[in-house]
């Protein structure tokens, strides 16, 4: 969530918005003293600081190269570093232009000494700019070399996979051994370049500005802050003084930036000698810290943002002590002393967000240390638990820095001094054309090719992965079985002919020559024969493309959500243990079983095309003007396989059409798989992979809801019960992955209890495919429901079959809203979700349960269609005992009617809920549903739940409503506040306590300062 505005901050000369600490029940004079302490700016009690700490001994400069390269992370850090260096250049160029203009104006009326000093300053800036330009060129050179090694490694990886699908022969084994040696060499080169690039990142200077707390900071409180960045550590202790000021035993630390690694911050309140209370623990992304201006950062330490750690972070592109040769030892010491004195002007107190006295002029040492003389860039961080470790940025100011959110929280920076166009380059991403999914091969403006009869018979079109059309529609996209059979047939004919191929340097593209020599006339015939026999369905691949990330991403997202709250509940500890066990099982799987079991479709062309970028023949470029080789054309060029080259290749070699597949692996980077295997983490069974990902994501969602509802025990208890069932699912998934290596042909082996519910088992068997027994798409389940039960449901409830089936699927997936038709094909239902849902509802016969559900849907549609008097009559007839339990769909519809513009309908529903709440059974179920709805992300449902709780007079929900009163959405805050005030004396007291500190402070000064608050 992005919150930003620009206006003057009254918080003091340093500009950080002060949080007026909650005064509790102390006297008026003490409360007034605390509030005033946030605005005054007198000097604080200060503990002596010996010298600036620096992590040279633990930094990356003395560390060994990483064991595995991280190309995606390197790309992200390179982009951020390049933008930061460019910003430094821009800042200094602006200052140079200003001084040059000033020099021209002063030549006539100034003394020689003044001109000499000004000219000397200009030359200093010019020298520093030349150094920056040289540094940029060095970084570009390293990154370009890294990209070349990455493509070589990627090509070797594809060759390994292509040989793995071919029959074993002596020549093949020798070639595979050579490829393995090359792959290892390329990997080592990438790691070495990463280590060298890491040395060019400069350093981060982090200055402690103090804690800001809402209702938390009281005189005498002692806190310990522990920061970890790779192998670098910084621990400091502080105390809140009586006058609201703060004293800390540490003031500044220098961290050396890392390519792989995030800043971890843990804040602990020291209660006594052996009593420590963990306030919060967060992880911070560092990419956006590469900026020319000092940045003031407010980090949300706890979930509600009531404790914030304020830091001032400055990035230096060069080591502070790594001076230019022209500067002697005296200058180096003087520069360091000046920098020390600048940061030691006062001990941190409760901070403010603007420092008007920062730099009025450019100091001399700024060009030695790399510090830009510009106004600080204020920003704020707010960390919250998100599914899969992802974050969502709401639309912010036009000049805010855009960025894609990944596995960790990111920093969003707003600078009002840079024009919007200057940051447009941030949106440019590097596209690696070396790996692609089957759906990425489609091109616009092409017509599908009509297949001959003999070719279309038995040709199964995979669901979710259609046969793509292209600039040359004659190309066919084959499945793994086809590619493997082609390689086997080609290699078995001449098993001893696997030897180096002589290439003509004047003939042209390397891939063209290799494919021309390696393809034969018999292969297309074999292709037609195999295609006519049919292909295996690739529904799992189509569904996987819609899932958010890989197994690694799902594991990381859950671990990130669990980490700060692992000790809060026993269920969290059990879940963490089971998930770690499953992760260990997958990491220990043999690489051979993965490469042969996963759905890869590699052929000679797709592997050899990886090396096209090595073709630098000038003669070839002159011979064929349509072919472009972009090696050396910039940082992006080494990843660019132009469509022009591929199209011209298809036209030159018509005999190669029709049998060469372009379906590559989804991810050929080195991940967390075993022993340098190029394949990602997998069980070896695509359906099982999808199932594990879905349950990991669902567990992440449950953990977040439990944390949010932890203050309301009956809601948390219900969610913990759901989580317990997921822990049992994780145990079964671990057993299946460990014992059977993912090769299960019957769902009974995964869930032995299924044989007791034969009707449910029979229906599931119809929904899934033979190779995907663990999952099915929601679309497929609904179609099977229509085929099996539509006539029965429509007979008793005409026209309700479709909404009944959609409602059932939504409930199986535990969704608050019905699924949209467009999302059905991308939603995955696992066999464990299917079995768990019907077991928890005591269902053994699907047909009878659908009739019950149809009755519920009938009531819902009746309520939605009636108005005023008819609605009042309908809800009056709807007695609380009409159903065995108040159904979720009915409760949801009643709540949503409260949000409508029809006052008569709202009044009718309010009267019904008030009357129905007298039934203890109804009230218990309704209270649980509406309180759980408050934890959902749907704002409309949250608002409706608040109004329903207001009608139920649910004082049990006060704590959750207090949390909702601090929402970023004003409408939700208002509705939650109104609901609180309607809940009698307890609600009024809770609202008054909430209102004792300014709401703007809860929003981290969103209305008072020029800042950005980002929720991760």
Curated annotation (Swiss-Prot):
Compositionally biased region (Basic and acidic residues): 444-454, 643-656
Post-translational modification: Phosphorylated. Chemokine-induced phosphorylation in neutrophils occurs in a PKC- and AKT-dependent manner, resulting in RIPOR2 interaction with YWHAB and stabilization. Phosphorylated by PKCA, AKT1 and MAPKAPK1A; in vitro.
GO molecular function: 14-3-3 protein binding
Keyword Amino-acid biosynthesis applies: no
Annotated SUPFAM superfamilies: ARM repeat
Annotated stretches, region: Involved in cell filopodia formation: 55-113
Comp. bias (Low complexity): 433-442
Annotated InterPro entries: ARM-like, ARM-type_fold, FAM65_N, RIPOR3
One Gene Ontology cellular component: apical plasma membrane
Regions of compositional bias (Polar residues) in chain numbering: 414-428
Chain intervals for the UniProt region annotation (Disordered): 44-73, 414-469, 636-656
Family: Belongs to the RIPOR family.
Subunit structure as annotated in this protein's UniProt entry: Homooligomer; homooligomerization is regulated by RHOC and leads to the formation of concatemers through the association of N- and C-termini. Interacts (phosphorylated form) with 14-3-3 proteins; these interactions occur during myogenic cell differentiation and also induces T cell proliferation arrest. Interacts (phosphorylated form) with HDAC6; this interaction occurs during early myogenic differentiation, prevents HDAC6 to deacetylate tubulin and also induces T cell proliferation arrest. Interacts with DYSF; this interaction occurs during early myogenic differentiation. Interacts with MYOF.
Role, per record: Acts as an inhibitor of the small GTPase RHOA and plays several roles in the regulation of myoblast and hair cell differentiation, lymphocyte T proliferation and neutrophil polarization. Plays a role in fetal mononuclear myoblast differentiation by promoting filopodia and myotube formation. Maintains naive T lymphocytes in a quiescent state and prevents chemokine-induced T lymphocyte responses, such as cell adhesion, polarization and migration. Involved also in the regulation of neutrophil polarization, chemotaxis and adhesion.
Protein's name according to its UniProt entry: Rho family-interacting cell polarization regulator 2
Organism, scientific name: Bos taurus
Gene name per UniProt: RIPOR2
